[in-house]
């Protein structure tokens, strides 16, 4: 059964940069997959990111973000890359409580945890998901 919801982390997952909050806007878009900040720091989308987002939307899969970042900076980067319109419920908050972010997303979108997939490179989330959502 395909997921009803894909929740994406940003740093090191959707894009190459490991901490978008450390960048210095404004951003300038270089091409479809790259932006640069005022300090000449480049941020590149993962090579599969665009296809994943487009495919999910075509199939009616909801998309959300759960990211520990400065919301102004992260959301500006998404806008400059033209990706903000893909997400049904972006949660970008300046704290490490991603479990609360995921719970907020599930509640807001009315999706059960077993119908959601979380994409992140952070292994600390895996153990939390196993305890809290997978039984």
Question: Model-predicted segments: where are they?
Answer:
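Phosphate- and divalent-cation-binding pockets in alpha/beta enzyme and binding domains
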Residues: 73-76, 101, 127-128
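Preference for well-ordered, secondary-structure-rich cores of eukaryotic proteins
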Residues: 19, 54-61, 109-117
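Acidic, divalent-metal-coordinating active-site segment for phosphoryl/phosphodiester hydrolysis
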Residues: 120-135
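Substrate-recognition element of Asp-dependent hydrolases with the DxDx(T/V) motif
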Residues: 44, 49-79, 89-96
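Active-site neighborhood of HAD-like aspartate-dependent phosphohydrolases
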Residues: 1-54, 58
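Conserved H-loop
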Residues: 84-88, 112
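Conserved Lys-Pro-Asp/Glu-containing loop-to-beta segment of HAD-superfamily phosphomonoesterases
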Residues: 2-4, 99-124
């Amino acid at each position: 059964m395909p997921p009803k919801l894909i929740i994406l982390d940003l740093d090191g997952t959707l894009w190459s940069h490991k901490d978008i909050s450390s960048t210095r806007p404004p951003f300038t878009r270089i091409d479809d997959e790259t932006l640069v900040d005022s300090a000449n720091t480049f941020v590149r989308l993962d090579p599969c990111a665009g296809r994943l987002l487009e495919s999910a939307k075509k199939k009616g899969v909801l998309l959300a973000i759960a990211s520990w970042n400065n919301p102004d900076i992260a959301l500006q980067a998404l806008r400059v890359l033209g990706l903000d319109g893909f997400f049904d419920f972006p949660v970008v908050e300046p704290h490490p409580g991603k479990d609360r972010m995921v719970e907020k997303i599930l509640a807001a979108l009315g999706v059960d945890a077993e119908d959601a997939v979380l994409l992140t490179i952070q292994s600390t989330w895996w153990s939390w998901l196993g305890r809290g959502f997978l039984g």
